[in-house]
Structures are given as C-alpha cells and as structure tokens.
Amino acid sequence: MMIKDILGNYSIIGTNQNESDETYNGTLSLGLDEKNRIIAKWLINKSQEQFGVGFFKENILVINFNYVGDENNTYFGTVVYKCFTKDILEGFWSEEFGNPQFLGSENCFRIKDQKELLS
C-alpha cells in the first residue's frame, strides 16, 4: 500500500483511555502536506476537533495529535493505526494525561462517495 491509498475520509468508532466501555463516534480526514506528511483532522461526537501530523510506512500510520479541551488546555497524544486495507484502519492511542493503565482504541472505515458505491 502507498501513502496516497489511505488518503480520504473515514467514519470512526473508538474507546477512551480509561476503564469505561463507552464508545465515541466521529470522522477522520487524512490528507498530505507539501512535505508528504499525513495531515489528520478528527471530529469526535460532532463537537470536538483534533488535529495531527504523521507518517506512513509498511502499512503502519503514526500520528501525533493535539486538541483543546477543558479550560482551553491543549492536550497531546499519539495514535498508531494498522492499515489492513485502504478502507479499514485499526488503531490504539494514548495521550499525555490519560490513564497509563489503559490505551484508547479506534477503528476507521472509509466513507465511500455515491460514485464509488455505484461502481
């Protein structure tokens, strides 16, 4: 798989870095910058935006991300995805103030446009 193969929009479902079994939903958009690095943008539960920059090698995608949380504090973390196909990514993540006894998880499924679905 090449880096260009994973670019696009994904529907996501994930769990947080804690003991809860609660899930979150959202979207992940992957693009490239002028230096051929992955640029990521998440929209979690239709309200929280997260941003990241990463790299791709041997079907592994690593993204360092950040977001503004409570009281305007900025939080940082890293997510690692295994790219099973260009349409399915499975990952785990951790952030600096998360519970170190847990990892968050995230599964991503490519959002196909109407044209692709008709093919």
Cite the ranges covered by each PLM segment.
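Central antiparallel beta-sheet cores of small beta-barrel/beta-sandwich binding domains
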Residues: M2-S119
